């Protein structure tokens, strides 16, 4: 697991560049030390991968177009692919450290169009109303997922069968998230997560909301 203190973007975009992300095993594990980021925050960005995270210590705030959620130590969650988000370190008493699994859904689903993708993956990642699936201690079902999530970060890449064990752990977690998200999937969503130009305009609005924004300025942010 790599310690990270900054974020990289694709040129001319706010899509996150993921160093070390390979097609033959589309997954990376990160330990984000938020206090070492410039300004103690990760700016607005998105990625085409799933973000599954667990708060090792401290607390962070996630911002998405749908609102803000505070995640203290011991909590966690899932950020859907293509969802615009930013994070801020909140705790001033302890280190704000976040553990992350970043992976392409093909790691779990296999070939595109597979039965697994159609039944268990697509219903979640194509639901525009699902930006975040938050997990907090105190809720029995969510606590079960959090325990599995915390344990999954203890797998060592040096041990025999690591890739298979990791995929097995992530698959079990995903299936539980699928069940947990049932009520969320039943709600109707309106916005399009995959439109990059809309994302760029939303970032501009979030960063300049105190100013008077003109239509030409907003258009220039995306074109």
Regions found by a protein language model. Name each.
Residues 51-54, 117, 141-148, 169, ...:
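Amphipathic, well-ordered alpha-helical segments in soluble domains
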Residues 61, 86, 208:
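Detector for the N-terminal beta1/A-loop initiation region of ABC nucleotide-binding domains
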Residues 40-46, 88-90, 110-113, 162-164:
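Short histidine-centered beta-strand/loop micro-motifs
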Residues 115-146:
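Aromatic/histidine-rich interaction motifs
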């Amino acid at each position: 697991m790599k310690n990270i203190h900054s974020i990289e973007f694709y040129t001319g975009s706010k899509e996150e560049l993921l160093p070390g992300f390979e097609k033959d095993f589309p997954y990376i594990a990160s330990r984000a030390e938020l206090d070492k980021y410039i300004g103690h925050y990760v700016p607005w960005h998105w990625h085409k991968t799933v973000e599954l995270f667990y708060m090792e210590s401290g607390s962070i705030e996630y911002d998405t177009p749908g609102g803000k959620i505070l995640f203290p130590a011991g909590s966690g969650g899932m950020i859907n692919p293509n969802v615009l988000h930013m994070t801020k370190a909140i705790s001033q008493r302890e280190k704000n450290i976040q553990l992350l699994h970043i992976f392409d859904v093909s790691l779990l689903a296999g070939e595109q169009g597979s039965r697994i993708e159609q039944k268990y993956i697509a219903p979640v990642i194509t639901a525009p109303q699902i930006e975040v699936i938050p997990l907090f201690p105190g809720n029995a079902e969510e606590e079960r997922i959090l325990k599995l999530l915390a344990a999954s970060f203890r797998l060592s890449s040096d041990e025999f069968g690591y890739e298979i064990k990791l995929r097995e752990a992530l698959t079990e977690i995903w299936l539980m998230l699928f069940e947990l998200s049932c009520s969320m999937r039943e709600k109707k969503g309106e916005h399009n997560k995959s439109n990059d130009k809309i994302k760029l305009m939303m970032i501009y609005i979030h960063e300049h909301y105190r100013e008077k924004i003109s239509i030409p300025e907003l258009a220039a942010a995306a074109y």
